[in-house]
C-alpha cells in the first residue's frame, strides 16, 4: 500500500466555501479512482491542497464525506438536466429533427458530462455498500428527471405530435435509448466524440418515434 502524508494548506488563502468545494471535488476524484475502500482522508487532503484537519473540519469522517459527494453530484446532475429540459421542443416544427437536437443536448450536458460519469461509476461500484443512499438518489435523481420529461412528452401527445398512453414509460424509454449506444464505451473509459453523440441521438429518436410517432408520420 502506498504511503500517504498529511500536507499543510499549500494553496493561496481561500474562503470556507471555496475550501469546501475543493474538498468535494478532490473527494469525487479520489473515490472514483480508488473506490470507497481504497480512498482515505490523506489522499483527499493532498488532492484538495488542504490539511487533513481541514477536511475533518468540513466532514466528520470518510463516510460522511462520501455521502456529501453523492448528494453534490446528484444536485449538479439534476441542475444540468433541468437546464437542458428548458430547451425541450414544446412546439416542434419537425418532430424528428427537434427531438434529435434535444437528445444531442441531453447526451452532451448530462449523460456524457463529468458529473454523470462520476455518478454512474460510484453507483456501479458502491451501490451495494450504501443501498439507502442510492435509493434516495434514484428518487431524487432519475425519479425527478423522469417525471419532468414525462410531463413534456404528455404535452406533445396532447397537442397531437405523439401517440402514447403512458408518458412516464415513454420518458424512461427515451432516456434509455439515448444512453444505449454510449453506455458500454463510457464504462470502458472512452469519451464519445460529437459524431458518435449525434448518431446515438439519431438512432434513439428514430426508434422512439417508431413506437410513439403519429401513424401518418411513421
Please provide the spans of the model-predicted regions.
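Helix-turn-helix
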Residues: 22, 26, 30-64, 68-72
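Amphipathic alpha-helical packing segments from all-alpha helical-bundle domains
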Residues: 112, 117-124, 128-158, 199
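An amphipathic alpha-helix signature
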Residues: 24, 67, 96, 100, ...
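Residues in soluble alpha-helical coiled-coils and helical-bundle/repeat scaffolds
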Residues: 60-64, 68, 90, 111-114, ...
Amino acid at each position: 500500500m502506498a504511503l500517504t502524508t498529511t500536507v499543510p494548506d499549500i494553496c493561496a488563502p481561500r474562503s470556507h466555501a471555496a475550501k469546501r468545494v475543493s474538498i468535494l471535488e478532490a473527494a469525487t476524484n479520489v473515490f472514483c479512482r480508488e473506490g470507497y475502500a481504497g480512498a482515505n482522508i490523506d489522499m483527499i487532503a493532498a488532492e484538495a491542497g488542504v490539511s487533513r484537519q481541514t477536511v475533518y473540519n468540513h466532514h466528520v469522517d470518510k463516510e460522511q464525506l462520501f455521502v456529501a459527494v453523492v448528494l453534490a453530484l446528484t444536485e449538479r446532475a439534476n441542475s444540468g438536466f433541468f437546464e437542458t429540459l428548458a430547451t425541450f421542443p414544446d412546439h416542434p416544427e419537425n418532430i424528428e429533427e427537434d427531438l434529435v437536437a434535444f437528445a444531442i443536448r441531453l447526451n452532451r450536458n448530462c449523460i456524457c458530462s463529468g458529473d454523470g460519469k462520476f455518478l454512474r461509476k460510484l453507483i456501479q461500484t458502491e451501490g451495494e455498500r450504501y443501498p439507502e443512499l442510492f435509493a434516495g438518489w434514484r428518487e431524487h435523481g432519475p425519479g425527478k428527471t423522469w417525471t419532468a420529461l414525462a410531463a413534456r412528452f404528455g404535452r406533445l401527445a396532447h397537442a397531437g405530435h405523439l401517440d402514447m398512453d403512458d408518458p412516464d414509460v415513454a420518458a424512461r424509454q427515451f432516456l434509455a435509448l439515448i444512453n444505449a449506444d454510449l453506455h458500454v464505451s463510457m464504462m470502458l473509459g472512452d469519451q464519445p466524440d460529437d459524431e458518435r453523440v449525434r448518431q446515438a441521438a439519431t438512432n434513439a429518436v428514430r426508434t422512439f418515434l417508431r413506437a410513439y410517432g403519429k401513424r401518418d408520420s411513421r
